[in-house]
Amino acid sequence: MDLLSDIEWYINSKPKTCVRKSTGLNLTKEELNSIAIEKNKNKNIRISFLVNDNFKYYVTREYNENITVEKLLSIIYYFYKESMDLSKLDDIFYEMDEWKDEVINYYDGNFKKLTNYNAFTDTCTPDFCGLEYDKKTDSYYVMIGPE
């Protein structure tokens, strides 16, 4: 997990564009293939993704195998490329009405074009800030934000 806290990566960029914060160098194949989260025999790995700039709404997914650093970054990347769950629009844009209107206007009212990434405002590019485990929810939380 120390490696994850040393990764600089913008979640809207391909995973292989990540670099080490400490050196500015690309991750090696060995680092990308290292295990980020090891699966317990008896239960799946739960990863929760932030889908709101105000830290109010998360989506949780379960995985049933070990997750390498590269796979984790790919999971995150593709999650934010997915179409937004339109039934959760009010939850996703909670306390962000102006941003919701801007995004909807940008896509000319075509809600089907919205992706999970659109939940974040354009004031800064969201970057990966690590992964935090919460015992209470038994879930790993993808930390997103400007550092």
Regions found by a protein language model. Name each.
Residues 46-48, 64:
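Mature soluble extracellular domains of secreted precursor proteins
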Residues 58-64:
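A short, exposed loop/beta-hairpin motif centered on an aromatic-Gly-Thr core
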Residues 2-18, 24-43, 53-56, 70-147:
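Ubiquitin system architectures
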